[in-house]
């Protein structure tokens, strides 16, 4: 029968190359010790009348994972660009576990005969090593949930201090400017460099620079305010989503 590989023969070589790149990126992800929690997302299915028909789990395949790794690359590149050009912007910051949460999770794990490595300063690799060791246990989901809750909540901040869970020293959000305001802010920051006539080897000047896009009216004080507001708005949206999904289930 007719195969998709025949229909998309013109892009197949690029897809094969992209898949090879994805495998290298996944290997690098493992080597830097990024945490890979096995969580299941759900989606709402609507009927012909736009009424909710069912809620089903999203089945992740390699296509989803390829896109995810590409997005991570874009976000890391954004953080590096913002830092290089000394732009006040919003980084995605994820601190390690607090002393209180770390003590609580160690107490819980100890009752199960488990141990989280790293002493007083565990790394993301220590978390991932423990996750790998429990994946075949019947209570793996419970243990994973407790471990996840021991971590700090990621926030938006103009101070770049790394992302504990992903194992990055610098990280920012860039890929979703139509739905996340921090991404839009970072797009504006990048455009201000592109259209501002700055000499840089990583910027290709546009044929017709737009002076309006070169204007970037934000300072660190404003970024502090935006970081606090967008972090709060994200938590509020997440809480609302969980409440609605729990009610519908």
Predicted regions and their residues:
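Electropositive polyanion-binding surfaces
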Residues: 1-249
């Amino acid at each position: 029968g007719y195969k998709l590989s025949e229909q998309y023969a013109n892009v197949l070589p690029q897809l094969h190359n992209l898949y090879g790149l994805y495998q290298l990126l996944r290997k690098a992800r493992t080597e830097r010790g990024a945490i890979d929690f096995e969580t299941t997302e759900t989606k709402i299915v609507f009927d012909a009348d736009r009424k909710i028909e069912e809620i089903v789990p999203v089945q992740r395949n390699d296509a989803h994972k390829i896109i995810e790794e590409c997005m991570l690359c874009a976000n890391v590149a954004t953080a590096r660009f913002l830092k290089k050009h000394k732009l006040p912007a919003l980084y995605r910051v994820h601190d390690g576990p607090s002393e209180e949460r770390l003590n609580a999770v160690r107490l819980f794990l100890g009752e199960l005969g488990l141990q989280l490595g790293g002493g007083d300063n565990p790394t993301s690799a220590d978390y991932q090593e423990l996750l790998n060791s429990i994946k075949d246990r019947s209570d793996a989901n419970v243990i994973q949930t407790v471990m996840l809750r021991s971590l700090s909540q990621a926030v938006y901040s103009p101070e770049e201090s790394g992302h504990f869970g992903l194992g990055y020293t610098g990280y920012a959000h860039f890929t979703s400017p139509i739905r996340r305001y921090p991404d839009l802010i970072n797009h504006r920051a990048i455009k201000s460099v592109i259209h501002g006539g700055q000499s840089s080897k990583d910027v290709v000047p546009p044929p017709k620079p737009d002076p309006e896009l070169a204007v970037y009216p934000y300072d660190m004080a404003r970024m502090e305010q935006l970081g606090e507001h967008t972090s709060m708005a994200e938590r509020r949206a997440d809480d609302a989503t969980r409440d609605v999904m729990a009610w519908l289930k």
